[in-house]
Regions:
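Thiamine diphosphate
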Residues: 1-162, 167, 297, ...
Length: 308
């Protein structure tokens, strides 16, 4: 691990590069450019930046319209407002006609911290998974967020990318990124731990703690929740016999359910979902809130030992 960078910042800077390479890329925001980091694109390419004001639903409709002109719209806001307030427009105006719109939402999960439960989206992955044809991506670090941004521009169809407010470690290994293909970051024989987003780093740290006790963990970064890498999930569940999923999201509808859907009726194994247990978030320092919901490395390690 090296420096800490938020995935939202990496996304914002990647948009600038992308805009230089592809003149069809346009960026829309809902009066939050300073927070979603689309401010970088606004400064570099003002003629292709559209601030729609506090009108997320309208922003999605505008993005849908721009896509019919051959443009590639990246619509940005907070996850609570994008996946929540604008859900109908995402479903009916973007996904239903299969328009090529990229919905990239920051400030997701309980790590938003002080903003509290009203702004901590713990349902967005589940909501987006439900929409037919919607691709769902959750980058683990800044490098992956950058690669995912470029990949989305090449990908044809509606997609949702979840980004974080909190700055987190950047992995030193420059592993490849391909939509729909999970990355195995650590090999172990005892437990297959599938994680996404900020929780990938916590999963790796938990694996180190458990290794010191003789428990070896495979850590798999599932950056694409939909379509999930079913082959990888099945392979490691069969290999290890114990499966744990870790996500900064409700345990209902997110990564855990996506993994369970793959394994149901195919692989017999112990299974545990670690995430937010059917409750809203609350206000506090990001580190304190993550600990409150059992999402720190030591807590994850303890839960895995309970499973074994």
């Amino acid at each position: 691990m090296s420096e800490k960078i938020a995935t939202r910042e990496a996304y914002g800077k990647a948009l600038v590069e992308l805009g230089e390479q592809n003149k069809n890329v346009v960026v829309l925001d809902a009066d939050l450019a300073g927070a979603t980091m689309t401010k970088f694109f606004k400064a570099a390419h003002p003629d292709r930046f559209f601030d729609c004001g506090i009108a997320e639903a309208n922003m999605m409709n505008i993005g849908a319209g721009l896509s019919t002109m051959g443009l590639i719209p990246f619509c940005s806001t907070f996850a609570m407002f994008g996946a929540g307030r604008a859900y109908e427009q995402i479903r009916n105006s973007i996904a239903y006609p299969k328009f090529n719109v990229k919905i990239c939402c920051s400030h997701a999960g309980v790590s938003v911290g002080e903003d509290g439960g009203s702004h901590q989206s713990i349902e967005d992955i589940g909501l987006m998974r439900l929409i037919p044809g919607m691709t769902v991506i959750v980058p683990a670090d800044a490098n992956e967020a950058r690669k995912a941004t470029f990949a989305l521009a090449e990908f044809q169809g509606p997609a949702y990318m979840r980004l974080a407010r909190l700055a987190t470690p950047v992995f030193e290994e420059d592993y490849p990124f391909e939509i729909g293909k999970a990355n195995v970051l650590r090999e172990g024989k005892d437990v297959a731990m599938f994680a996404c987003g900020l929780m990938v780093n916590e999963a790796l740290e938990a694996a180190k703690l458990l290794s010191a006790e003789g428990i070896e963990i495979s850590v798999i970064n599932v950056h694409t929740i939909k379509p999930i890498d079913a082959a990888c999930v099945t392979e490691y569940a069969q290999k290890c016999g114990n499966v744990v999923t870790v996500e900064e999201h409700s345990v209902i509808g997110g990564l855990g359910d996506a993994v369970a859907d793959v394994l149901m009726g195919k692989v017999c194994c112990k299974f545990r979902k670690i995430g937010v247990n059917d409750q809203f978030g609350q206000s506090g320092k990001a580190a304190d809130v993550l600990r409150e919901y059992g999402l720190t490395a030591d807590q994850i390690a303890a839960r895995i030992k309970e499973t074994l």
